[in-house]
Amino acid sequence: MKLTCMMIVAVLFLTAWTFVTADDSGNGLENLFSKAHHEMKNPEASNLNKRCAPFLHPCTFFFPNCCNSYCVQFICL
């Protein structure tokens, strides 16, 4: 019983250690928190306020803004 508990604790510790020490080249959490803080100060900067293009409306390949579809040849499909 004690060995099982020790194994569970060891696995949980190693899993947490893997996530903590993982190489995040984009500083994901740091960028996430700073972005959230910026959106609280400026609500217009939130992604929820951005509009998307409906089906068969124009879009750009590099910055697609289609709602629930893909941008194919500058049209939301």
UniProtKB/Swiss-Prot annotation:
Which residues would be cut away as propeptide? 23-49
Q: Where in the cell is it found?
A: Secreted
Name positions with the PTM Cysteine amide: C76
The protein's predominant localisation is: secreted
GO MF annotations, alphabetized: ion channel inhibitor activity; toxin activity
Any single GO CC term annotated in Swiss-Prot or TrEMBL for this entry: extracellular region
Name of the protein this chain belongs to: Conotoxin King-Kong 2
